[in-house]
Amino acid sequence: TEFGIQKPQRKSGNSRSPQYDTERNGYYWNDHIRADFNAYENLNYDEKAAKELRETGFGTVLSFNNDGIVAGTGLLWTLNDTDTNGFRILNNKISQHLTFKRSSLSGQAYPSSLMGSMALIKQLYHDAKWYAAGGSKTKDISLDVFNQNKNLVQIFNAGDKLNILRADKIGDEFGINYVIKGSGNELERIEEIKKTNATLIVPINFPDAYDVSDSFLAEQVVLSDMKFWNQAPYNLKVLAENNVNFALTTADLKNPKDFLTNLRKAVEYGFPKEKALAALTEIPAKIANQNNIGTLKKGNLANFIIVSGDIFESKSSIQENWIQGNRNIIEKIQPSDIRGKYELTIDSNKYDLSIEGEIGKIEAKISQNKTEFGTKVTYNDPWITLVIKSKDTIDSKFIRISGLKSDTELAGKAILENGKEVSWSAVKKTETTEIKKDIVAEKKGD
């Protein structure tokens, strides 16, 4: 993703004549090689964009500047609004990026074709090897950093299915194992792509349905486009069936909110849920060589989401997204209604507990033999805490209880006035129980 990257601007100029030479002294002879660009040095954390990604379920992203045949380095950071970049950044230089596309910052004429881009990349590798062997008497900043970054994850934004094969072939020639980003049409060359054994990054930007209500416009729709529109949701299923290792990305989507919708559609079309989960968690973590994200285990970052149901079902919604231990509420959960009258037991002592008020703003009253106790209640479904003030008005002491709501009761642990820890429970009184108590009270009154 290009999230949070402050893009450098091209210098203004009105020259219409072709530019053949580099504009940068001390760098590689071709300005479309931007190996010296470091994403971490050009950051502009965008809270609005971060919120959109969190709502889709993301907590950690790999950001880079997708500009140039060598686009520089990317960083790994979290979508954590509450802290600074110093805390958000997990790795400031995690990857080196390549594409077949020219840089928008340069007007240099070469390369002007896909074939030219491939030739330039090959020339770069040869020049880098020559430079590393001490072949140059002068310093070349681009070749210097390109060689330094060879130990990083090498990500090639290839795009089209055929370009995946082209990128892999370049990698084979120079002994580079690229992680290759595709375009979502990999199923059309699945046999060749499978043989590459490359790890892919796959977008799920399914094409919109064509409007064929106008007969004239309908005739302009190409059959191959219609066929791809029909087959696109099967792409992830086909990749999984052929044991292609891949992660998923929001790249190429007009709106990040379409990510979950399209992913659920892919699952509906046969993409296994366990494969989908791995493509969102463990596989991206392995691509980034990070062992403290992607799984929930002791020592890992507290990054996880809370969902109302199965994440891959359309009726489910993301309710919370926790990032580096910070809670982000996506959809406010309506707390369950625990109002009513309870029989409260603390250790072996019985009390009457009444929970009243509005849902989300409850109040509690506790009494014993008609003696009322000062009570403060906090309820954060399913957790409940109660502070009960002692009957002694001179030497005030407290009983502190906390616990969970279950289907049948409220229960947990209590700290008594003397510091002793005991169990407690509160069982909701039925209407029948209340009636019986009233009858007993009436008889006593008679």
Residue spans for each PLM region:
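Contiguous, well-ordered beta-strand patches that form the walls/edges
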Residues: 369-408
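Tryptophan-anchored aromatic micro-motifs
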Residues: 333-352, 361-370, 375-377, 410-417, ...
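N-terminal pre-domain segments of enzymes
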Residues: 17-21, 422-446
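His/Asp/Glu-enriched, well-ordered alpha-helical/loop segment
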Residues: 7-9, 16-25, 36, 153, ...
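Metal-associated gating/positioning segment near the N- to mid-region
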Residues: 1-56, 61-64
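C-terminal cap of metal-dependent C-N hydrolases
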Residues: 301-334
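Glycine-enriched alpha-helix->loop->beta-strand junction motifs that scaffold or abut catalytic
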Residues: 171-177, 194-201, 243-245
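Polyanionic/metal-chelating signatures
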Residues: 45-187, 291, 311, 317, ...
